[in-house]
Amino acid sequence: LKKKMALIFNTYPRWDRLVSCSHSVMEVNYKNLCKPNIKNKFSYAKNTINFQRVYDCLEEGCQYEGFEEPNSEEINFVTMGRLSPEKNHKNLVRAFGEYLKEYPKSKLYIIGQGPLQEEVEGEIERLGIKDRVVLTGNLLNPFTLMSKCSCFILPSVYEGQPMVLLEARIVGLPIVVSDFSSVEDSLMENGQYLIKSTQEAILEGLRAFAKGEVPTCKFDPRQYNKEAINEFEQAISK
């Protein structure tokens, strides 16, 4: 992978602009990749969001295969992403195991697949919480399930611009999110509960939601897209 990435980096002098997906990511790229012949090429523009797909999925609904719809009388946490090291699922599962000792009427839904599937399953088995953690696999329509849950949690160690946070905001979920290096560009005023990515901090975030301390904010995806397009136009016109 490093060799492949090096080949890509070597092409950078050929391009007019090197556009990152957020200001924070641009700063990281500038710090790690900048050379004299490309230092004026760095810019950024947020990704746009296909909000209509989310709305269409919510309207269509879906049938669940292999698991039941979340019980509205319980606290239901949900996360979505590839089962890979940076997503930090094992720390999430361990924290949730501790959380269940205090709030047993809760469930955790993990949407996605990936190389750590067996390890995550093994951790769930070891903790004896198979009846409280649901691994859904990949879903064509994850948003209906998300809409039936209580809170979205993203405990990642690192991210670029996590689109899943925007999708969770469109669905209207309260959000607990870790402070990965580029998180600043994904935050909204009074729009999330920020934690570290350690097991102890994730447990703190889960408890915070149970205590009513995790906020929900209004999110306008159309306005967001207008701003993202404006950023892109500015990025390529410099």
Segments from the language model and where they lie:
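Aromatic "clamp/platform" in nucleotide-sugar-dependent glycosyltransferases that forms part
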Residues: N138, V157
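Conserved acidic donor-binding segment of nucleotide-sugar-dependent glycosyltransferases
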Residues: E189-E200, A208-G212
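Short acidic/histidine- and often glycine-rich active-site loop of Leloir-type glycosyltransferases
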Residues: M163-E167, F180-L194
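A conserved mid-protein helix/loop that constitutes part of the nucleotide-sugar donor-binding site
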Residues: I75-E98, P115-E121
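Nucleotide-activated donor-binding/catalytic signature segment of Leloir-type glycosyltransferases, i.e.
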Residues: E121-G137
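A charged, aromatic-enriched C-terminal amphipathic alpha-helix characteristic of glycosyltransferases
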Residues: E213-K238
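A short, active-site helix/loop in glycosyltransferases that binds the activated sugar's phosphate group
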Residues: W15-Y44, I49-R53
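Short hydrophobic beta-strand element within catalytic cores of glycosyltransferases
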Residues: P174-V177
